[in-house]
Design a protein with these regions (language model features):
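Periplasmic-binding protein-like
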Residues: 42-45, 93-105, 122-125
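Structural motif
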Residues: 75-89
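Hydrophobic alpha-helical segments within soluble ligand-binding/sensing domains
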Residues: 3-41, 140-161
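Hinge/cleft segment of the Venus flytrap/periplasmic-binding protein
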Residues: 155-199
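Short beta-strand elements in bilobed, periplasmic/extracellular small-molecule ligand-binding domains
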Residues: 15-16, 63-79
Length: 199
């Protein structure tokens, strides 16, 4: 998708297949609407060096704008300018969205140390980031994704399937989760259909 393939059907046609950890981006925008219906501005915080993050924030931005939010990009180039950019996002946003971004995943403490004192909730692209700095997520299970990947590999090794005929697979299910510590600190009431992250 980051390569501009609009009609990708999951088949590469060569000796490549596997699984994708792409989250349900439209539905992630939906949980922002569900949890923060009165918010006006959403800051999209991501690393500009990660093409996967750019794709995610572009998609979420389009969905959020359809829901009536004003969105701004807050891109940082690496961990050295994350704090400065995050502070700008916190100063100007009612809510911050962070995709499944590797740089943020490795620096959630920086994000939390800025956003939580500022009273700005972070909705994350997956549970690992949420556990460090987010209030909620609609996340895949990397365990379940690993099981799916293993089953694909088994089919190839046993000769049941040919790799070039196997479409890319996606996570079989997603879970609404919340971080009880951050939710309590920010005074946010979470609906009953969210599962408390116990990491």
């Amino acid at each position: 998708m980051a390569l501009g393939i609009d009609d990708f059907d999951g088949l590469v046609g060569t000796n490549i297949s596997g699984t994708s950890d792409l989250a349900p981006l439209d539905e992630q925008a939906g949980i922002i609407k569900e949890l923060f219906p009165d918010a006006k501005t959403v800051g999209l915080l991501y690393c500009s060096a990660e093409a996967n993050s750019q794709y995610q924030v572009d998609t979420v931005k389009a969905s959020l704008e359809e829901l009536g939010y004003t969105c701004e990009y807050y891109a940082f180039s690496d961990s050295n300018d994350l704090a400065t950019v995050c502070q700008s996002a916190a100063d100007a946003s009612d809510v911050i969205y962070v995709p499944t971004d590797n740089t943020v995943a490795n620096n959630t403490e920086i994000v939390n140390n800025i956003c939580q004192p500022a009273g700005v909730p972070v909705v994350a692209g997956e549970e690992g980031i949420m556990s460090g700095c987010g209030v909620a997520t609609l996340s895949i299970s990397y365990y379940d994704l690993g099981v799916a990947t293993g089953k694909m590999a088994a089919k190839i090794l046993t000769g049941e399937s040919k790799v070039e005929e196997m479409p890319i697979e996606y996570a079989p299910q997603f879970t609404k989760e919340y971080n009880p510590t951050i939710a309590e600190a920010l005074g946010i009431t979470i609906p009953d259909d969210y599962v408390a992250y116990e990491g």
